[in-house]
UniProtKB/Swiss-Prot annotation:
This is PITH domain-containing protein CG6153. GO terms for cellular component: cytoplasm; nucleus. It comes from the Eukaryota. InterPro entries: Galactose-bd-like_sf, PITH1-like, PITH_dom, PITH_dom_sf. Residues 20-192 form the PITH domain. Belongs to the PITHD1 family.
Length: 211
C-alpha cells in the first residue's frame, strides 16, 4: 500500500524536525548511488540518456529541469543494474501534475535487458499509481520477493490519458550489499542515526562490516 511522507506542521517549532526528516529521507533514499548508471537502459525515451536523469538525490526530486519523456507512445521501460545486491523496501515515483503521470508500474527483478515483449510477462509485483508531483508517496514492495536484487526493471505501460508519459523522479529505498575480498559490507539506508551527522557525508556511520 502506498503512503505519504508529507506532514502538516502548525508552527516554526517544527522547522528543525522538518529539516532532520528531510536529511533522514535523503539518507534512506540513497540507493541511486548504487546504480550502475552507465548501463541503465530506458526504452522508448524521447532523447537518448534522458531516463538516467530521474535517478537523483531525494532533495532534488522536485527539480523539474531533469526528466524523461516517452517517445512513440506512453510506454517506458527501465532496465536498472546495480553494483551489488539490494533489498528493496520502498519506491517513490514522481511525475507531472497532469495526465502524463504514469498510472501503473510493473516491477521485475533480476531479468537484465528486458524488452517490451518481455514485459508482457507476469511481474514480480505491480502498483496502481497515484499522481504525485511532489514525490511524497511511497510504495512498499514485498521485502521477501525483493530481498536479493542485482537488476531491477520498471515497466510503465500507461498513464492517465496523455499520448506521452513524463517522469521526474524515481527513488529507491532499502539496503545494499557489496562483496569485498575481506568480507561483506552491508549499508543500511534505514539507519535512524542523527541525520545532522550525515549532512556532509551521507554514508558515514551507515555501513558495518561482517567478517
Amino acid at each position: 500500500m502506498p503512503h505519504g511522507h508529507s506532514h502538516d506542521h502548525g508552527g516554526c517549532s517544527h522547522e528543525a524536525s522538518d529539516v532532520d526528516h528531510a536529511l533522514e529521507m535523503g539518507i534512506e533514499y540513497s540507493l541511486y548511488t548504487k546504480i550502475d548508471l552507465d548501463n541503465v537502459e530506458c526504452l522508448n525515451e524521447e532523447t537518448d540518456g534522458q531516463g538516467k536523469s530521474v535517478f537523483k538525490p531525494y532533495e532534488k526530486r522536485q527539480d523539474l529541469s531533469k526528466y524523461v519523456e516517452s517517445d512513440a507512445d506512453e510506454e517506458l521501460l527501465f532496465n536498472i543494474p546495480f553494483t551489488g545486491n539490494i533489498k528493496l523496501k520502498g519506491i517513490i515515483i514522481s511525475g507531472a501534475n497532469d495526465d502524463s503521470h504514469p498510472n501503473m508500474v510493473k516491477i521485475f527483478k533480476n531479468r537484465p535487458r528486458m524488452t517490451f515483449d518481455d514485459a508482457r510477462a507476469k511481474p514480480d509485483q505491480e502498483f496502481q499509481l497515484t499522481r504525485d508531483a511532489r514525490g511524497e508517496i511511497e510504495y512498499s514492495p514485498k521485502v521477501v520477493t525483493f530481498s536479493s536484487v542485482h537488476h531491477l526493471s520498471l515497466y510503465f505501460p500507461s498513464n492517465f490519458g496523455e499520448d506521452i508519459t513524463r517522469i521526474y523522479y524515481i527513488g529507491l529505498r532499502g539496503e545494499f550489499t557489496e562483496a569485498h575480498y575481506h568480507g561483506v559490507t552491508i549499508c543500511n539506508y534505514e539507519s535512524r542515526a542523527n541525520a545532522a551527522d550525515h549532512k556532509e557525508k551521507a554514508f558515514d556511520g551507515v555501513g558495518r562490516a561482517i567478517q
